[in-house]
Amino acid sequence: MIEEKIKIPKWSIEQVAHVVRIAYKTIYNWIDQGLLDINVTDLPDHGIRRKRAKETRGTFSHGRSIEDRPAEISDRNTSGHFEADTVLSGKRKGQAVATFVERKSRLTIVKRLNGRDSTSMTKAILELANQLGDNLKTLTVDHGKEFANYNLIEEQTGVPLYFAHAYSPPERGSNENRNRVLRRFIPKGQPIDEITDDELIQINRYLNSRPLKCFNWRTPIEIFLRNLRY
């Protein structure tokens, strides 16, 4: 079970340790002793914390500032407030994916984009709004050019977009964190075009069925569905 959870849904050692009810240091010791068929490439970030990649997207400077976002959103007290971002393959052209992370539950929705342009992102957000309805209340984004159609998005969905300050990833910390987990399934350099729709669906399932320590080891989908009932 330990090897399966680390290699397939790509859980962290701490997540596995909680489920099997042993100390996470014990699992590390077993790996070091060669008792488990796990190596460093199977671990989150391959055991290495990497520097943030240099930003290559175009940007713009308009839109509603995150400073105007209600405090209840910042405090994660209410559901329905998402952060959005783009994850690229590492190539300058080709498909990408959009990631939408609900701030309260960390529910993560990954959608395919035909490109890194505003038309592709606008289509993805409109689809998301149609799927979630009233459960999509706001979006917090950066100033990447893919969000340049924010006026159109707000007009068609009624969902306000809040723009984080430039070079301030912590203002979209949920998105940054979940994107790092996503990279375990879509390594940088892997063409998004090679990922099938079924594989993308499975990645969404894996991301939302991972027990999180911040929720006392409940999963994002559990928290999200519970919030819908109250």
Roles of regions detected by a PLM:
Residues M1-A166, P170-S174, R184-P191, R205, ...:
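Secondary-structure boundary/capping micro-motif
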Residues K188-Y230:
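C-terminal domain-tail junction helix/linker
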